[in-house]
Amino acid sequence: MSVHINAEKGQIADTVLLPGDPLRAKFIAETYLENVECYNEVRGMYGFTGTYNGKKVSVQGTGMGVPSISIYVNELIQSYDVQNLIRVGSCGAIRNDVKVRDVILAMTSSTDSQMNRVAFGSVDYAPCADFELLNKAYQEAQKNNLPVAVGSVFTADQFYNEDSQIEKLARYGVLGVEMETTALYTLAAKYGKKALSILTVSDHVLTGEETTAEERQTTFHDMIKLALHTVS
């Protein structure tokens, strides 16, 4: 067991999907997996293990933001030797060529978090996705006629931020804004593990367009199926 996860060794699979919302973790496990077992309820941050197409897969809620996901990724790797970590979450689009309901494969991530400045000092470390997972996800999307955008995302340290650089980031090719990918990719690199963020565009920062609950659910289904096909 670790501080925030009370699973026994062997209860967590080598591959873990990481939604931010613990209730979304519960939904994923109950909807997509078979032979489901709940291994964690500490602080209400649910974790489940089941099988998908015969492959053992876990789903662990992470909470929101760099500090929260860092806790769970550290513990999953250090205490349970997880090898593959796939974030499945939402983001806000910041470019006109990225539409609401699109799915983004995050190739790399920039951030205003101080996480890597603390670790690397004056060096601007650029964390990126594992190429094998990224390529597999892209190929699966192509095979299933699922449109995806591949590129950079921005991991914001604040959800409400009046002093943002959104327009400049968009000019530099950043596709969307979220709150966790930089931490995931950095920690995966630190420990020699594989990581990928697959994101559903739930709203558009520039136009104000948002998805309805029903539309989010449909696109969310595409994202989860893509993640599961990538690792199965």
Curated annotation (Swiss-Prot):
GO terms for cellular component: cytosol. Pfam families: PNP_UDP_1. The active site is at 203 (proton donor). Phosphate binds at residues 20, 24, 43, 87-90. It catalyses: a purine D-ribonucleoside + phosphate = a purine nucleobase + alpha-D-ribose 1-phosphate; a purine 2'-deoxy-D-ribonucleoside + phosphate = a purine nucleobase + 2-deoxy-alpha-D-ribose 1-phosphate. Belongs to the PNP/UDP phosphorylase family. Catalyzes the reversible phosphorolytic breakdown of the N-glycosidic bond in the beta-(deoxy)ribonucleoside molecules, with the formation of the corresponding free purine bases and pentose-1-phosphate. This is Purine nucleoside phosphorylase DeoD-type. It comes from Bacillus velezensis (strain DSM 23117 / BGSC 10A6 / LMG 26770 / FZB42).
